[in-house]
C-alpha cells in the first residue's frame, strides 16, 4: 500500500491503452515524460461545513483546478476540484469528500464521455494527505493525464477524511472507499455536460481495494450508473493475517510502516480501540511521526522502524487482539457476489500485501461466481505490470466479453 510507487506504475497506462482505446473514443497516444512524486507545497484550513442534501453524488462545492496544475492544463483538459456528498461505510451517515475531475479536450464520443474513477494508493490518514491538495496530485497527475488523453473523464477522489471534505479517514475500511468511488462517478456524471453513465473503477493498493469494493457495492448503491468493470492492482483483500503477523512478530519492514495507519483507521470504525494497546515503546514514542503523510520525514520513519522490536505491534492482551480482529475481519473481500467483470493483479514477491492473501480472495470470489480475471506475476512485488489490466479495461468499455480465469 505504498503510495510512492503508485504514480510510477500508473504512468504506463497510456502506452498500453492507446491502440485499443483510441478506436473507441478517438485520441492520440500520450507522451511519456519522466515521473516526479515530490509533493508541492500546500496549506490546509479547517474543513468547511456543508449542508447535506441526502443525495449521494451531489456536488457541494467546486472550483477551477486548471490554474493550479500547469502540466494537466497543458493537455487541454478542463480541470475541476470539487467536494461531493457520499456515505460513511461505518454508520451510513452523509459525508463530504473532495476530488479532482479532468474532462478531455475535444468533442465527446457518441453517448457522452465515459468515466474512469481512479483510486490512489496509501498517502496517509490526515486531512493534508489528500492528493487533490497538491498541484501534482502527489504524483497521480500522470494517471489522470493518461486516462484523460485517452478520452475518459477521469476522477481522482481523496477518500473520506483526506483533503477538504472533513471527517476522519477509516483507513482500509472498504465500504467507505467503495461509496466514495461510486459517488465520485455519480458527481461527475450529474454535474458535467455530455456525460455517459458508463464508468470503470480502477485502483492500486488501497485504491485497488476501493475499486473491488465499488464493484461489489454497485448493484445496491450505484443506481443510475453503468459500471462496466473494475481493475484492482495489488489490493489488500484480507488484513486479518496482518494482525496475526504482528502477534507472531513476523511483520515485514513495510508492513510495520503501515500498522500505525491501520490502527488509526480501526479506531475510526470502533472508537473503543486504543492504538496504544498495540504499540511497543518505539511505536508509542514515535506515534505522531508515524502518522504523518507517507512522503513526510522518510528518514525519521526509517530510523523508527529500524529500532522496532519484531513484536512491536503485538496486542497487549488476547482480548485486545480479538477486538482488532473483529473490526479488521469486516474489511475482508469478497463480501458479496458481483456480476460485473473484475481484473485483479498481484505480485508473487509482494512483501506488503502477501500474494497468498490476494490469491485466497480471488479463490473466494471465484467460489461466489464472480466474473474475475486474475493474474499472479511471478517476478513482481507490490509494483505490478498493468498491461493485461489495461487491455481488460479497454475490452469491457468496448462491450467485449472477457473470459474468467476461475
Named regions from a protein language model:
Residues 28-108, 366:
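Catalytic-loop region of hydrolases
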Amino acid at each position: 500500500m505504498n503510495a510512492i510507487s503508485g504514480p510510477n506504475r500508473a504512468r504506463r497506462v497510456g502506452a498500453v491503452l492507446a491502440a485499443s482505446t483510441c478506436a473507441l473514443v478517438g485520441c492520440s497516444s500520450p507522451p511519456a515524460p519522466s515521473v516526479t512524486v515530490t509533493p508541492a507545497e500546500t496549506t490546509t484550513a479547517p474543513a468547511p461545513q456543508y449542508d447535506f442534501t441526502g443525495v449521494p453524488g451531489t456536488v457541494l462545492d467546486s472550483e477551477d483546478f486548471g490554474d493550479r496544475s500547469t502540466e494537466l492544463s497543458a493537455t487541454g483538459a478542463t480541470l475541476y476540484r470539487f467536494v461531493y456528498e457520499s456515505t460513511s461505510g461505518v454508520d451510513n451517515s452523509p459525508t463530504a469528500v473532495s476530488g479532482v475531475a479532468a474532462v478531455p479536450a475535444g468533442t465527446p464520443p457518441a453517448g457522452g464521455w465515459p468515466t474512469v474513477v481512479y483510486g490512489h494508493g496509501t498517502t496517509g490518514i490526515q486531512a493534508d494527505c489528500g492528493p487533490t491538495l497538491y498541484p501534482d496530485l502527489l504524483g497521480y497527475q500522470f494517471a489522470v493525464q493518461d486516462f484523460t488523453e485517452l478520452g475518459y473523464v477521469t476522477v481522482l477522489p481523496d477518500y473520506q477524511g483526506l483533503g477538504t471534505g472533513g471527517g476522519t479517514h477509516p483507513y482500509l475500511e472498504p465500504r467507505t472507499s467503495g461509496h466514495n468511488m461510486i459517488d465520485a462517478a455519480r458527481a461527475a456524471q450529474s454535474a458535467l455536460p455530455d456525460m455517459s453513465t458508463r464508468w470503470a473503477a480502477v485502483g492500486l493498493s488501497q485504491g485497488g481495494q476501493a475499486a473491488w469494493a465499488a464493484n461489489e457495492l454497485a448493484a445496491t448503491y450505484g443506481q443510475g450508473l453503468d459500471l462496466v468493470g473494475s481493475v484492482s492492482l495489488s489490493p489488500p483483500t484480507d488484513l486479518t493475517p496482518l494482525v496475526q503477523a504482528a502477534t507472531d512478530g513476523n511483520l515485514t519492514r513495510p508492513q510495520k510502516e503501515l500498522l500505525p495507519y491501520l490502527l488509526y483507521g480501526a479506531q475510526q470504525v470502533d472508537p473503543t480501540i486504543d492504538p496504544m494497546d498495540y504499540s511497543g515503546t518505539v511505536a508509542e514514542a514515535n506515534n505522531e511521526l508515524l502518522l504523518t503523510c507517507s512522503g513526510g520525514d522518510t528518514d525519521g520513519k526509517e530510523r523508527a522502524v529500524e529500532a522496532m522490536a519484531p513484536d512491536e505491534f503485538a496486542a497487549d492482551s488476547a482480548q485486545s487482539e480479538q477486538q482488532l480482529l473483529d473490526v479488521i475481519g469486516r474489511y475482508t473481500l469478497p463480501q458479496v457476489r458481483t456480476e460485473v467483470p473484475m481484473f485483479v493483479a498481484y505480485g508473487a514477491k509482494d512483501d506488503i500485501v502477501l500474494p497468498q492473501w490476494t490469491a485466497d480472495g480471488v479463490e473466494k470470489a471465484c467460489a461466489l461466481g464472480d466474473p474475475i480475471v486474475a493474474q499472479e506475476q511471478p517476478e513482481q512485488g507490490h509494483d505490478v505490470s498493468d498491461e493485461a489490466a489495461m487491455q481488460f479495461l479497454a475490452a469491457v468499455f468496448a462491450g467485449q466479453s472477457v473470459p474468467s480465469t476461475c
